[in-house]
């Protein structure tokens, strides 16, 4: 195997019983000729169709297969995070278990990674998905992510990606953030590129994606943009807003004082209420900013709560 870096293939699995054996055969066919040490980490995300039994049979036959079973269905992002934690090699490749991603593209992704990039993201340029329910929402979401993140990829939702381990270790995932891994990597200084990959129609099982996921993606994108800019300095947001309100409030106070003391106009005007509202809002915003600073500092000084809980693991060096 020489000095070639090892590969960890991480696959979240949710009710893909009929796809697992042909998928593992294709992975073996694609990875064997590379001459690299490798492992295939399957993460069962609460499957109820017998997928775990199929995975155990695969692991019993092939020492490259390592299994992680979550206690219930936590979602794709926690499942991928569990796979990252239990993987061991310097290069990590992710793909779906539905046979729509093609394992034959893995060697190309790894070769593109080389010494020049930290993330190589797959681009399903010619997708085999329904236009209305999958392609249209995907195009809209990808456009918004490109514009808001500044990362010029075409297909953030493609699970087939190759990463250097150190980049994965530098980011934290929650919600539906797995699709933003290239964005997070770029924001921490990672070098990201894109490579066209094959995409096949689903022939077995049912899709876990739908229109509701687009809404979640957009909410996560807005949250991510806010957190990336202000998570370590919340007082820049609340403090700036508070100071602006206080400045306008004092300006309104000057106008009111001029009307009363110079012009002798004693009647109540809406400007008085606007002044009070601005001064109160500005003061409260400053206090909220100070409290947010304290909370954020405490948060970064403590260990984060995990987004998943493992029921059992199986494979080499693991208890079955």
Where are the model-predicted features located?
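Acceptor/aglycone-binding surface of glycosyltransferases and processive sugar-polymer synthases
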Residues: 57, 64-72, 76-86, 91, ...
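Short beta-strand/loop segment that forms part of the nucleotide-sugar
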Residues: 35-46, 68-69
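Hydrophobic helical membrane-anchoring modules
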Residues: 2-3, 176, 180-320
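N-proximal low-complexity "stem/linker" segments adjacent to membrane-targeting elements
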Residues: 1-29, 36, 320
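Acidic helix N-cap motif at the loop->helix transition within catalytic regions
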Residues: 18-22, 49-58
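A conserved acidic beta->alpha catalytic loop
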Residues: 44-53, 99-100
